[in-house]
Amino acid sequence: MTRKIACSLLLLILVTIGLNIKTKVGLTRYPSWIVAKIVDSKPVKLTADFTHVLSNSSTAYIGYIGNNYQKFDISLQSVHKSTANRYTVTGVTMVRTNRCNFQGTIDVVENRQFSHPTFGLDNSMKGQFKRRGCTIAKYRFAENAQQKGSGVFVGYLLFYWYETNKGEIVYDDIDDFSDSYSNNQYAGTWQSYATKKSKPCAWGQYRVPNSGDLDVGAAEFSVNPKYARNGWSK
């Protein structure tokens, strides 16, 4: 009997190790900045329309372009769901005084549900939602080639949502009181049509992903003084 119990425990341990390895291997296909934010989550099947999450404009995007962290501004003017996992997008970008229009797509790669969700300040949201989750997607935004200084943005996007008790998927601002709170996080590259050269580029709401030492703020985003002259001092 003791031997059977020992064998059963060993089998359970091996299965658990195997599942953990499988999970870690599955996550390695994503950028490290995304992996760090989804460790407490698992894949979930979800049929949803994320239009209102992606088009949320409750706060402006903060962004940079280039290794010198030049200030980068972007706004989404329209977001429409075109297929089960694709959204078509139009918008405007601005670097210094150079303004470009763009259009492109956002393609959902995976939906995930958090295993141990929090419930907001003083647990005020406890019992107010079915689940909290996030979505990993890829984006490709092409600026108008006829405009000066234009190019193409490609990369990964991570955004957060929660499902209400009525089954509605909404923008997750439950933890917006937290210093580290962020949403709609984009990070990738921009490639010039003219020179074919690429630059790192990222933007997000409240915080900027994959931004090195750009953000030195504790309670909120605050640009590192050594980059202030790159468009941030206005």
State each model region's role.
Residues A202-D213:
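Short beta-strand elements
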Residues G149-D176:
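Acidic, glycine-rich flexible loop segments
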Residues V25-S75, G91-T93, G120-G149, L157, ...:
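Tryptophan-anchored aromatic micro-motifs
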Residues I13-Y30:
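Bacterial Sec-dependent signal peptides at the C-terminal "C-region" and cleavage site
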Residues Y69, T97-T105, V152-Y156:
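Amphipathic hydrophobic-ligand
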Residues M1-K4:
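Positively charged n-region of N-terminal signal peptides that target proteins for export
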Residues R86, T93-D107, S115-P117:
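Mid-length scaffold segments of soluble, non-membrane domains
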Residues C7-L12:
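Sec-dependent N-terminal signal peptides
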